[in-house]
From Swiss-Prot:
Record-linked CDD domains: Ribosomal_P0_L10e
Keyword annotations from UniProtKB, A to Z: Ribonucleoprotein, Ribosomal protein, RNA-binding, rRNA-binding
Pfam short name (any one): Ribosomal_L10
Molecular function in Gene Ontology: large ribosomal subunit rRNA binding; structural constituent of ribosome
Biased composition regions of type Acidic residues, renumbered to the chain: 312-330
Protein's UniProt name: Large ribosomal subunit protein uL10
Species of provenance: Thermococcus onnurineus (strain NA1)
Keyword Chaperone: no
């Protein structure tokens, strides 16, 4: 039986205790993080999370032991995500907040050959501080629209030299460093995070907060409307359900001419409008003074509202003309596309 060094036993024991002591356990890759940025990250995490860097094999043993002692076999799924130079990040912060904190803590870094970029790399249009030389030819060989203007290299338009995930070549590293473009990031890359029996990957944690909030708001409104329309009472919808039922009952009573303190005004108002409609078609000598007065008031109201209605009609016509023009433009564009 091979002898196991005491420091390894102690390390596994300490890692196991850390894993057992926190509700959220994350794996992070610290392989390409220089010592100084790593120390700054430790400072930023102080009071929020505990970072422990160790050997991958020892981390794996600690996860297995903690999973067994806690009776949580799903914790072992974290082992599948150990890679690079792994470290354990133990915290009470939920995985989404932890991921956001780590991403916001990353700082730009210069280009290095052989390293994939985390996102698209774009060389912006405009003048540079680079003097004419062999670098211009290298740029043009890569398709970068560069030329000499006023004794300096100038980029004619924005140009994407790398897509996310593509690897930086030696030639491109020289160009990007000369331009002062830092396409890489220095920081802790979250590999996976465990909480309450679930292992979260970066793809799951990288959410658009505004979009997520909008989706939640839409879901709430759909659920609210469903509850109201099906008359399923909850603490949030009971008031709207009662209001809807009240208005529905009132409308039925008004339509049926059933007089109550709540419907009497609507019923008599409806009856009055019907009477005035009939009176408009009768000879004037058959009408009493009160009816004439009411008809006159109705006519004045109609005259006052007519300009507003005409304006709305004109606006609608203008909108229709604009829509027709845009449709014609679109059809013309399609014709050009297809010859």
């Amino acid at each position: 039986m091979a002898h196991v060094a005491e420091w390894k036993k102690k390390e596994v024991e300490e890692l196991t205790n850390i894993i057992k002591s926190y509700p959220v356990i994350a794996l992070v890759d610290v392989a390409n993080v220089p010592a100084y940025p790593l120390s700054k990250m430790r400072e930023k995490l102080r009071g929020k999370a505990l970072l422990r860097v160790s050997r991958n094999t020892l981390i794996e043993l600690a996860i297995k032991r903690a999973a067994q002692e806690l009776g949580k076999p799903e914790l072992e799924k974290l082992i599948d995500h150990i890679q690079g130079g792994a470290g354990i990040l133990a915290t009470e912060m939920n995985p989404f907040k932890l991921y956001k904190l780590l991403e916001e803590s990353k700082t730009p870094a210069p280009a290095k050959p052989g390293v994939p970029v985390p996102r698209d790399v774009v060389i912006p249009a405009g003048p540079t501080s680079i003097s004419p030389g062999p670098l211009v030819g290298e740029m043009q060989a890569l398709g970068i629209p560069a030329r000499i203007e006023k004794g300096k290299v100038s980029i004619q338009k924005d140009y994407t030299v790398l897509k996310a995930g593509e690897v930086i070549t030696e030639q491109l590293a020289r160009i990007l460093n000369a331009l002062g473009i830092e396409p890489l990031e220095v920081g802790l890359n979250l590999l996976a995070a465990y909480e309450d029996g679930i292992v979260y990957t970066p793809e799951v944690l990288a959410i658009d907060e505004e979009e997520y909030i909008n989706l939640l708001q839409q879901a709430y409104m759909h659920a609210f409307n469903l509850s109201v329309n099906t008359a399923y009472p909850t603490s949030q919808t009971i008031e709207a359900i009662i209001q809807k039922a009240y208005l529905g009952a009132k409308n039925v009573a008004v339509e049926a001419g059933y007089i109550t303190p709540e419907t009497v005004e609507d019923i008599f108002g409806r009856a009055l409008r019907a009477v005035l409609l009939i009176a408009q078609n009768l000879p004037e000598e058959l009408l009493d003074e009160k009816t004439k007065e009411l008809l006159n008031q109705q006519a004045q109201i109609a005259v006052a509202t007519q300009p507003q209605q005409e304006e709305k009609v004109e606006e609608a016509e203008e909108e229709e003309e604009e829509e027709e023009a845009s449709e014609e433009d679109a059809l013309a564009g399609l014709g050009a596309l297809f010859g």
